[in-house]
Amino acid sequence: MKPDYKLVAKAKYIHAAADLASELWHEVYKRYYPAKQLDTLVDALQSADVIEEDIDNDVNYFLVFLGDKLIGYFAWKMENTALHLLHLYLRPEYRGKALGRDILASCERLARGEGRGRVSCEVYAKCLPVMQFFKARGYRVLAPAETVVEGIPMQLTTLEKML
């Protein structure tokens, strides 16, 4: 069964995206941040208000469904010469089943179709399986991209693939 991608535009989908983001961020980042810091990061970066503001600033959020099951989400924004992939998260039981690969390939096709020469993303530097996922698909490490959110440092790495 192939997944369906639903564009997040209505309030109910914004809240569904925020709820799923909170669930997945807590699952992915619990080994790197204490619970309180993680709550702060989720609220600052993936709350319903933040997602709505992102959408108002031309970020495209999609919910990923397999049949009637909500299994993940991703978000991207077109920039001058690149599609910037902001988020790509799947529930644990759906990882390793080529779904992330297919989402990434769709983003790359879209970027090519829009005349963009590359896809870029920032990955949490300590998430080695995620780094490996992108490297295995031809992405190269550009540079560290440390940022501070609500006083909490986030060690990110910028990756890029030329199309």
Name each model-derived stretch.
Residues M1-K2:
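Basic/polar N-terminal segments that are highly enriched at the extreme N-terminus
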Residues Y5-E93, L104-S106, L110, E114, ...:
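Acetyl-CoA-dependent GNAT
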Residues A48, L128-M131:
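Short, surface-exposed alpha-helical segments at coil->helix boundaries
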Residues L90, Y124-A125:
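Short amphipathic helical patch at the helix-1/turn junction of helix-turn-helix
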Residues A98:
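Conserved G/P- and acidic residue-centered "switch" motifs that form tight phosphate/ATP-binding loops
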Residues R101:
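Residues forming the Rossmann-fold NAD(P)(H) cofactor-binding site
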Residues A111-V123:
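Conserved GNAT acetyl-CoA-binding A-motif
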Residues S120-Y124, M131, K135, R140-L156:
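Conserved catalytic-core motifs of GNAT/GCN5-like acyltransferases
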